């Protein structure tokens, strides 16, 4: 629903509700975490969480895009993250690993989402679900990665 002036009921011209996007990211984290632990198939994981998510208002299309994107691009995401980690991807705590994979997907494949939003959401998600200091690790990794992955947007000189 739009208000006069072309803004949605959320005050944004693009019609995106940031609250619903945040919920979708949290649910995507849970789905990616479950996938990492169980090794299930992407369609099964998405179907399970999409069914559960039906009771919680969230951006279902965005949730599905995140989960499918991470699961189908896992190897590329892990390769992209590796230079910014102080250990192998598999040695990173499972929650922080899921947060990093989701954020890496958004930073690399969802150029429509500002890098600051991606990093802030990842930090908040890591605070909520991760280890006591996991959010600081996530922040450090993503800050360094964003300088390279989003050079134009972050204003990095490349030097």
From Swiss-Prot:
GO terms for cellular component: cytosol
Keyword annotations from UniProtKB, A to Z: RNA-binding, Transcription, Transcription antitermination, Transcription regulation
GO BP term, example: transcription antitermination
InterPro entries, A to Z: NusB-like_sf, NusB_fam, NusB_RsmB_TIM44
Disulfide bonds: none
Sample GO molecular function, one term: RNA binding
Pfam families from the UniProt entry: NusB
Superkingdom assignment: Bacteria
Protein function: Involved in transcription antitermination. Required for transcription of ribosomal RNA (rRNA) genes. Binds specifically to the boxA antiterminator sequence of the ribosomal RNA (rrn) operons.
Family: Belongs to the NusB family.
Protein name in the entry: Transcription antitermination protein NusB
Annotated organism of origin: Xanthomonas axonopodis pv. citri (strain 306)
GN (gene name): nusB
